[in-house]
Amino acid sequence: MIHSNLIPNAQFNDSYDLENLDDLEIASMEQSHSDVSLEVDTPGTYKTDGLITKKKKLALVVKTADCMPVIIADENKIGIIHIGWKGLENKIFHKTILNFN
């Protein structure tokens, strides 16, 4: 459950509606405003602020409020990055691009 201090008494379920997505696996992040990105090929929740995968049917999930979600891709890989001011200051975008290549 996610609570908002911007909208009084608001509650949002932390879940994914995957009813129509057969055979889809999910990799999500326990985001901590770090400069860490990981390449993954299995579903799960990873302590990172960037995910990269070559695996088809592995959905990468990023959650944002006032941070910036970034998607990167080429013919073989896809990646997502959660960038807040701290991650930006610690060069997570640059480090994830290096990890991506």
Please give the residue ranges for each predicted region:
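Active-site microenvironment for binding and transforming phosphate-containing groups
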Residues: M1-N101
